[in-house]
Amino acid sequence: MMKKTITLLTALLPLASAVAEEPTLSPEMVSASEVISTQENQTYTYVRCWYRTSYSKDDPATDWEWAKNEDGSYFTIDGYWWSSVSFKNMFYTNTSQNVIRQRCEATLDLANENADITFFAADNRFSYNHTIWSNDAAMQPDQINKVVALGDSLSDTGNIFNASQWRFPNPNSWFLGHFSNGFVWTEYIAKAKNLPLYNWAVGGAAGENQYIALTGVGEQVSSYLTYAKLAKNYKPANTLFTLEFGLNDFMNYNRGVPEVKADYAEALIRLTDAGAKNFMLMTLPDATKAPQFKYSTQEEIDKIRAKVLEMNEFIKAQAMYYKAQGYNITLFDTHALFETLTSAPEEHGFVNASDPCLDINRSSSVDYMYTHALRSECAASGAEKFVFWDVTHPTTATHRYVAEKMLESSNNLAEYRF
């Protein structure tokens, strides 16, 4: 949700021209022989373990170390690489996510409950943070075993960060490619269910591509379907899909609601046609309650608010339709929660829902490039008590709170087979 991004992205994304020259493959373009050849091209890679350096979530700065074995040698994982574009590699391995996580935890040996350890594949210190996909067993139970996230900056855990060569958002003020000071809602859901999360969401994304490098949800679906084809024993029916987008379309790109409805419907059609059965959907929050709209006209606020309300009715209708068809659909009313969260934060354990925790006093995407101090009120109370981290995006405490509400027994998600 970054306003007036085109000039900034031109400077930020040196790989954008490469992306334009290398169109993303579709699953139909990957032959069975290429799949077999790729899977047989076995190699190994190293694991980069990231962690928060501070004991407080008020400080999002991170650092990393190579994962090591108990004898001090470098820990490696066997598998194979594949990519649809030159800089977006994924490493497929039979090593489980739990084994990799445990090796990172043992290597770092941190007595820090807020370390928020995460890990990526990397061949050398100059590599990007590449996703590690753990292949499924040939014999697997009929239950959810992973989460796939599609969407925008509310779900992005590092894609735009990689594309900007680790500069956007600034890692000293935003947590390692997250538009927050820590984990986002999809990560909290995955952790609560002890499942790996695979992120296709991109900060700034709309339903369709914007400015070359901002991969829209339509192309995110294409990318997911293509990468999934290279995975061994993968069953889409055993994946929980999260889908949230639309705010960028209305706030930043002035797209009409009919266009966004079409993108949303197409994403669900393509996913279900590919075998997806389990979905976590959400209504859009009223973005005009975010601090950035202190700097907007009432006309702009009314226009965006009306679009959000209309889009939410469509999302509800889509959820009802697919549920009637027998799909496992959980629709969480994020809009209703944010209404009470922003109007009465104290009732939810927060103290401030009108100001950002970071000391930012304008609405400008340029600010994502800089390091910012905390607002004095946030420094006093702690980021855990603020609803918003910057002028647009929630704190990790808000993300965690929303995820907890999603996981409550009163919601359908609690009834899924995990």
From Swiss-Prot:
For this protein, the record's InterPro entries field holds: GDSL, GDSL_lipolytic_enzyme, Lipase_GDSL_AS, SGNH_hydro_sf
User: What GO terms describe the biological role, i.e. biological process, of this protein?
Assistant: killing of cells of another organism; lipid catabolic process
Q: Name one GO cellular component term.
A: extracellular region
Q: GO molecular function, one example?
A: toxin activity
Q: Which residues form the active site?
A: S153 (nucleophile), D390, H393
Q: Which UniProt keywords apply?
A: Cytolysis, Hemolysis, Hydrolase, Lipid degradation, Lipid metabolism, Secreted, Signal, Toxin, Virulence
Extract the PANTHER family matched here.
Answer: GDSL ESTERASE/LIPASE EXL3 (PTHR45642), SECRETED EFFECTOR PROTEIN SSEJ (PTHR45642:SF141)
Can you say what this protein is called? Thermolabile hemolysin
